[in-house]
């Protein structure tokens, strides 16, 4: 693939995720948008690693590291969301005042 096409696609994914993260009022949707942002960043890591340094796997290894961190973040985030839903019966961000007390 051409470098510019992949970078434009990654920028679109990043901007869609950022827009969703800013405008989202649902915690699960916000987590999904955060994962979309991380996938756009991973796409850039793999693209630049392949384009600039074809023999090294530094970008690919860093991408696997980010995927592992994102999986842990998603698991912890969903556990927190399910706990808040169990206690508050809502997953709306603006209704959750659990951390303010």
Curated annotation (Swiss-Prot):
Main location: plastid
A cellular-component GO term for this protein: chloroplast thylakoid membrane
Transmembrane residue ranges: 2-22, 32-52, 61-81
Topology with respect to the bilayer: Multi-pass membrane protein
Cystine residue pairs: none
Subcellular location: Plastid, Chloroplast thylakoid membrane
Function noted in UniProt: NDH shuttles electrons from NAD(P)H:plastoquinone, via FMN and iron-sulfur (Fe-S) centers, to quinones in the photosynthetic chain and possibly in a chloroplast respiratory chain. The immediate electron acceptor for the enzyme in this species is believed to be plastoquinone. Couples the redox reaction to proton translocation, and thus conserves the redox energy in a proton gradient.
Alphabetized NCBIfam families for the sequence: PRK05715.1-2 (NF004320), PRK05715.1-4 (NF004322)
Protein name as catalogued: NAD(P)H-quinone oxidoreductase subunit 4L, chloroplastic
Provenance organism: Crucihimalaya wallichii
């Amino acid at each position: 693939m051409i470098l510019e096409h992949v970078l434009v696609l990654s920028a679109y994914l990043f901007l869609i995720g950022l827009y969703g993260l800013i405008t989202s009022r649902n915690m699960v949707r916000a987590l999904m948008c955060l994962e979309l942002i991380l996938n756009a960043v991973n796409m850039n890591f793999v693209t630049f690693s392949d384009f600039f340094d074809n023999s090294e796997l530094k970008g690919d290894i860093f991408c696997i590291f980010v995927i592992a961190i994102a999986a842990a973040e998603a698991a912890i985030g969903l556990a927190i969301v399910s706990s808040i839903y169990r206690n508050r019966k809502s997953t709306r961000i603006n209704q959750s005042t659990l951390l303010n007390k």
